[in-house]
Amino acid sequence: MKNTMKKPVSIPVEKLRPFEGHPFKVKDDEEMNNLIESVQTQGILSPLIVRPIESTEEYEVISGHRRLHAAVKAGIREVPALVVSLDRDAAAIVLVDSNLHREHILPSEKAFAYKMKAEALAHQGFRADLTSDQLGPKLTVEMISESDSASQVKRYIRLTNLIPEILQYVDEGRISFTPAVELSYLNEQEQYDLLEQMELNDCTPSLSQACRFKKISQEEGLTPEVIATVMSEEKANQREMFKVPMERIRQYVPNANAKQAEDFVLKACEHYRKFLIRQRNRDER
């Protein structure tokens, strides 16, 4: 990565633009509030990485979108940034690599990040055939991800074929990763027909149902009637349900997805059960 300037410079926030199409969400949540507080008290400790936008006096942010957002929220007018000379593909690779180490990454973020990096590598001349089982040189796969296998990378990229509404279900933990991969083989209209049934019946397809949908879609096409019939089948894990709106749990676990919130509630119930047992034992003495 060739630096246009060796040391960070101060750049007005109004001259900074987000990287076009970057896959990582910048959310106003508890983590952002903590970052804003840190920026207010300590400033931005790690400079942003930016690149000049041709024929303008503006810059495109490669790394540091969350820090920039926190700075704007904190009322800071200028931020330190390292200006580098990179083409879009090289910048995309740096952007992805600088974000994949984060503790909390949504499935959709990882999916589009892997896709962005694979496309950038392909533009640079590396083989990144993610549609077949033969990925080409092992080095290419390792360059896409150091933590996920080639097959897992392909499965994540499959998620980019999901319509936004179903992908949101995946991010919220309401549809598991493996069924979501199977659903990604449905065409757009089939996915919207499925979404309608999911919302109508307040349920999501199991892995078995998702596999059946994929098979029917590839063999003869999936109709709304078939989707309704399959979704009306009772799943073992849906025979008896107790639901609590996420809004009522957010104050206790603000950053949790649906699965993490469920685990929190179950652990809380177990602690309370033990408390009641201890209380009863004391009363019986």
Residue ranges and their predicted role:
Residues 27-30, 34, 65-66, 91, ...:
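Charged, alpha-helix-enriched surfaces in structured cytosolic catalytic cores
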Residues 102-186:
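Alpha-helical interaction elements
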Residues 275-285:
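Short acidic DE-rich linear segments
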Residues 150-268:
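Amphipathic alpha-helical extensions and coiled-coil-like segments
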Residues 40-46, 124, 134, 191, ...:
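Glutamine-centric residue-chemistry signal
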Residues 1-84, 90-104:
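Short, charged/polar connector segments at secondary-structure boundaries
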